């Protein structure tokens, strides 16, 4: 379906326009009849925005957005810049929980992880390989946030912030949550080191006791 490209997003936008064909749902009927060019522009923009939410094209969109900010401001470029600005906006909104305070954000991550794992369970029942981050036997989204922030979140929000300074409060929230994850990672590593040290100490004690028993015999 859809040549295996952005299947979920293509399905959503195609279904939406199918619904718009119903008279009781077509709130754009006047626009379609009186301003067909405006309707075509709306349709094109709606498709671009929905397809932009596919994480597979994240890097491509961020790169195009950065390039558009340096381009000459002719009419064609302005339209493209406007579309890319909206695409960046909807992508950031799609990840909006990352900019919430920690308690709320962490709840979102847990819910997201369970949704991912539920899909992975269903894929396994169908005899399929679980999709990335959807296998319960492997680390899920909650354990991979530092990499996600570094490779996806900061480039995305940072690029928008460079063009729209008003995004600063979101960047502050992102940095706060990222710091939490880093602190958690440090605690986990320290905990692992302490556990290894305790196990080594126990092994040394057992070796010492065993050696003394052998000598006594």
Question: Can you say where each PLM-predicted feature lies in the sequence?
Answer:
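Divalent metal-dependent phosphate-bond-processing catalytic cores, especially two-metal-ion Mg2+/Mn2+ enzymes
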Residues: 1-217
């Amino acid at each position: 379906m859809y040549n295996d490209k952005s299947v979920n997003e293509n399905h959503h936008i195609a279904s939406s326009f199918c619904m718009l064909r119903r008279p009781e749902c077509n709130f754009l009927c006047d626009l379609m009849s009186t301003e067909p060019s405006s309707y075509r522009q709306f349709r094109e923009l709606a498709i671009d925005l929905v397809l932009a939410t596919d994480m597979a094209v994240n890097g491509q969109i961020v790169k195009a957005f950065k390039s558009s900010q340096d381009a000459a401001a002719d009419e064609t470029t302005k339209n493209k810049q406007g579309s890319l600005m909206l695409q960046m906006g909807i992508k950031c909104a799609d990840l909006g929980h990352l900019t919430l305070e920690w308690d709320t954000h962490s709840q979102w991550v847990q819910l997201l992880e369970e949704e991912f794992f539920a899909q992975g369970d269903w894929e396994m029942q169908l005899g399929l390989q679980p999709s990335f981050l959807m296998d319960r036997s492997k680390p899920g989204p909650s354990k991979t946030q530092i990499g996600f922030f570094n490779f996806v979140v900061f480039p995305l929000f940072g690029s928008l912030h460079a063009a729209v300074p008003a995004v600063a409060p979101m960047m502050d929230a992102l940095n706060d949550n990222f710091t939490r994850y880093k602190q958690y990672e440090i605690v986990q590593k320290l905990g692992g080191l302490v556990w290894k040290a305790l196990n080594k100490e126990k092994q040394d004690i057992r070796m010492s006791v065993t050696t003394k028993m052998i000598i006594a015999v």
